[in-house]
Amino acid sequence: MKGQSMILKDLAAELEEVVSPINLDCEEEIETEEVDCPAPFAVEAVCHVCEQVLRLAVVASPDGILQLQQLLLTDSLSFLCTSCSREAFCNRRPQRNGS
């Protein structure tokens, strides 16, 4: 250090003046907002290939569940079990987004 020689006691006193302690135990309360967390829905479907029963849990709005139900009932969406999925994608890269 250049200038006056300082001792640890002086340094601590200087730092104490610069850093004023803040009381973190104040009586202030923050209002908490409750977030609506939709309940999960149980979906049962069958594998498109082997017809094994598949059980899924999904979280969606009531409109989303209705849309999923319509997709499943019109055969425009089908699921594969893990075994059939592995067999379908064995030795090739899965196509993405229908391409």
From Swiss-Prot:
UniProt keyword annotation of Transferase present: no
GO molecular function, one term: DNA binding
Main localization category: host cell
Positions of short motif Nuclear export signal: 65-73
Cellular component terms per the entry's GO annotation: host cell cytoplasm; host cell nucleus
Keyword entries, A-Z: Activator, DNA-binding, Early protein, G1/S host cell cycle checkpoint dysregulation by virus, Host cytoplasm, Host nucleus, Host-virus interaction, Inhibition of host innate immune response by virus, Inhibition of host interferon signaling pathway by virus, Interferon antiviral system evasion, Metal-binding, Modulation of host cell cycle by virus, Oncogene, Transcription, Transcription regulation, Viral immunoevasion, Zinc, Zinc-finger
Gene3D superfamilies assigned to the protein according to its UniProt record, in alphabetical order: 3.30.160.330
PTM annotation: Highly phosphorylated.
Residue ranges of the region described as E7 terminal domain: 1-37
GO BP terms: DNA-templated transcription; symbiont-mediated perturbation of host cell cycle G1/S transition checkpoint; symbiont-mediated suppression of host innate immune response; symbiont-mediated suppression of host type I interferon-mediated signaling pathway
Residue spans, zinc finger unnamed: 47-84
Keyword Metal-binding: yes
Top-level taxon: Viruses
Entry's free-text remark on domains: The E7 terminal domain is an intrinsically disordered domain, whose flexibility and conformational transitions confer target adaptability to the oncoprotein. It allows adaptation to a variety of protein targets and exposes the PEST degradation sequence that regulates its turnover in the cell.
Role: Plays a role in viral genome replication by driving entry of quiescent cells into the cell cycle. Stimulation of progression from G1 to S phase allows the virus to efficiently use the cellular DNA replicating machinery to achieve viral genome replication. E7 protein has both transforming and trans-activating activities. Induces the disassembly of the E2F1 transcription factor from RB1, with subsequent transcriptional activation of E2F1-regulated S-phase genes. Interferes with host histone deacetylation mediated by HDAC1 and HDAC2, leading to transcription activation.
Protein name in the entry: Protein E7
Organism of derivation: Bos taurus papillomavirus 6 (Bovine papillomavirus 6)
Taxonomic placement: Viruses, Monodnaviria, Shotokuvirae, Cossaviricota, Papovaviricetes
Gene: E7
